[in-house]
Amino acid sequence: MSEARKLFIKTYGCQMNVYDSERMAEALGAKGYVLTEVAEEADMVLLNTCHIREKAAEKVYSDLGRLRPLKTAKPDLKIGVAGCVAQAEGEEILKRMPLVDLVVGPQSYHRLPDMLDRTEGGARVVDTDFPEEDKFDHLPERKATRGPAAFLTVQEGCDKFCAFCVVPYTRGAEVSRPFARLMAEARGLVERGVREITLLGQNVNAWSSDGRGLGGLIRELARIDGLERLRYTTSHPNDMADDLIEAHGAEPKLMPYLHLPVQSGSDRILKAMNRKHTAEHYLRLIERIRAARPDILLTSDFIVGFPGETEADFEATLDLIRAVGFGSAFSFKYSARPGTPAAEKPELPGEVCDARLQRLQALVTEQQRAAQMAMVGREVGVLYEKAGRLPGQMVGKSDHLHAVHVEDKAGRVGDLVRVRITASAPNSLAGERLGA
């Protein structure tokens, strides 16, 4: 039997890219590839990329440059670029980087084995089509899982066309995977030891199939024996349907955590962003969600320095943050993306954006620390995902998605235990196992 070929995948960006990387590895497994964590050992290197911000795209080119010595030393090494930079740049990647053998967009990665065959004769291949066939119909059944928590893509693409965002151009229109196939994939994950599933989509709460919305899907998934926890990300405020909000109160397996991006607290900027909602709409939505699940922890996304943002607009964003009280948030300076409507507008001075980002992050950090301190003394569920750095220590995620370190010599990966939180650190909690 010939020795297995080795595949190294570097994943950038969102959770969906993590899921996509797993599926690409499975597709290439049919060609005899096994994963390695060392690029120098690999027969193929695949960069699964993100295009949300300019720095993310440029980092890909920097990483490709660092692969030149490896390609020189191993001329037969195959190098591929996948994901949203691949979709956005296509042939340009081959022009800028002669060492790249193939470029594949996020809707075409089921074709990777065939593309790889075409490179064997020296061809350089690009596939960034939006094929009519569903890529999920052409991928092998998921066989491997990495621990007790897994991602499950239920929806792809976005029809919202926010003025700053490339997702509609790189991922395409909103597409929902069929209900029956999702149920089958979820059951398969549980059979392989998964106890927590996070449902993924660029606009996950836009999912619909067979007359069901995301709330209905969650209710059906919750009936699977052995599946203990459910989460979903990322959502748009306009698609928080009544049945989904109700599921937060009615379904115990749906964890008390929600990431709901708002981007700005200024109605003027929200309109310029084409977000199609107001700050007041968002605040009323938060009230309804908290009425359904009072202990829910909320997180969000913010962009500072969007073209035209005034000091008053920025203060409105700070006011919204104070009004909601977030457990954490991702915040960024505006980054113009080519081809988006906002890219045509004049940008704010860099020093203004830097100062605003610092102020916003200071407020969010203050709220995050308060939220974590409020957990001290409380009992929570923790799903162990790995052993800790210290002997006899386990690390897992709480119901609210906090990382929790627990001294538990008898603990095993996959255990779902009750823990009393005893201490809070900047990015994690510590606790003691109950009933051990």
Curated annotation (Swiss-Prot):
Residues 373-435 form the TRAM domain. Keywords: 4Fe-4S, Cytoplasm, Iron, Iron-sulfur, Metal-binding, S-adenosyl-L-methionine, Transferase, tRNA processing. [4Fe-4S] cluster 1 binds at C14, C50, C84. Residues 5-121 form the MTTase N-terminal domain. Residues 144-374 form the Radical SAM core domain. GO terms for cellular component: cytosol. It catalyses: N(6)-dimethylallyladenosine(37) in tRNA + (sulfur carrier)-SH + AH2 + 2 S-adenosyl-L-methionine = 2-methylsulfanyl-N(6)-dimethylallyladenosine(37) in tRNA + (sulfur carrier)-H + 5'-deoxyadenosine + L-methionine + A + S-adenosyl-L-homocysteine + 2 H(+). Monomer. Catalyzes the methylthiolation of N6-(dimethylallyl)adenosine (i(6)A), leading to the formation of 2-methylthio-N6-(dimethylallyl)adenosine (ms(2)i(6)A) at position 37 in tRNAs that read codons beginning with uridine. Belongs to the methylthiotransferase family. MiaB subfamily. This is tRNA-2-methylthio-N(6)-dimethylallyladenosine synthase.
